């Protein structure tokens, strides 16, 4: 599997704060940016507004980040880190359907925490070629992770052997990002309904209709 994109490799970030109060301020800036990016988008959110939402002076922002763009990179890096920590290893005796539902729910819960960053990134990359290139790398990485999951599930009893696994991984990854984008206008019940629908769709793309009771070893 390809390595996770390193969005900060060329960034000159201020050092990680050592004092607890400074770490708390950095966290407040991140939370404020996520909220404002979600509410107003990237261009309509200013550094001054981020600092104000965090109840901090504008100068404090520059002690932690050199620009709004750098903060966006940090937030997306945080999202990728959280995504990389999602384990695909199933517990013994769990059904593939249950595993899929649990994985999708955990992944979606993680992604929703960074919805503001995702929406800001999608906007910013329209006028920032480097962010657009980074987005291609992100998508290649997330598609590879989906492919790894499908490869694992394909080994389970009852799995179909006649489907094209790579194109299916790309379709599922595209579906996941699309659901995240649309979730901003959904209620919690609607989000769970979409997760259930995605689980059903993916499961029946991989497993025969008679495989429902099979368990992973």
Regions inferred by a protein language model and the residue ranges of each:
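N-terminal intrinsically disordered/low-complexity leader segments
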Residues: 1-24, 210-217
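Generic hydrophobic, amphipathic alpha-helix propensity
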Residues: 22-34, 50-51, 71, 75-83, ...
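Solvent-exposed, amphipathic alpha-helical segments
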Residues: 28, 32-40, 82-90, 171-182
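Helix-turn-helix
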Residues: 28, 36-70, 74
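Hydrophobic alpha-helical connector segments
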Residues: 74, 88-116, 165-172, 195
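Amphipathic alpha-helical packing segments from all-alpha helical-bundle domains
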Residues: 81-84, 109-113, 129-155, 166-170, ...
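Short, hydrophobic secondary-structure boundary micro-motifs
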Residues: 118-121, 133-134, 162, 188, ...
